[in-house]
Amino acid sequence: HTPVMDGLAAAGTTFENAYCNSPICAPSRASFMTGKLVSEIEVWDNGTPLGSDRPTWAHALNLAGYETTLCGKMHFIGPDQMHGFQRRLLSDVHGPGNERLVANWEHRDVSRAAMTREAFDESGPGDYVYQQYDDEVARRSVEYLGEPARGEQPWALVASFITPHNPLIVRQQYWDRYYPEHADQPGIPGHRETLHPHNQRMGDWFDY
């Protein structure tokens, strides 16, 4: 179902043994931009900004004579929404602040896991603003590639999409490819009891 992606992989370089640098969005993207571990740049969660004094690969490409352009989500927190990029074709879907996604450790009864559980309960076919946002990312990125200036100097474009993402809503044509005929996931009796106690507690959070 992914002929374009398959073609890009066949004609380019495929990293078959690569791993995400953080399970959380903003820290992962900050690590990607700086080439540093999350522990080095201290972007611990989705509410912590990346310091503007941190050099990114966009800065390095600028010095090498590239035009650097960002289109779409990069989850930059705070007033610096560029971090080295010279152009931005579309602002972030979240806006510059995301403090609501920071864990509140003082209130034990406040759980973000409930939000995640609800996303699965609400999953299904439909149209959501994130899909519309991604459509605009694609449109503006293609428009950028067609600009005459692309042949005048080296360039680097980051086209960054948000989906798949909670809420797990997908357009009908894609939903029908898998559900209900091709998504049989029966329960496994006794599976929870085989898990480490910490993982069992995580299961309790998702049932909150």
Predicted regions, residues:
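Formylglycine-dependent sulfatase
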Residues: 1-208
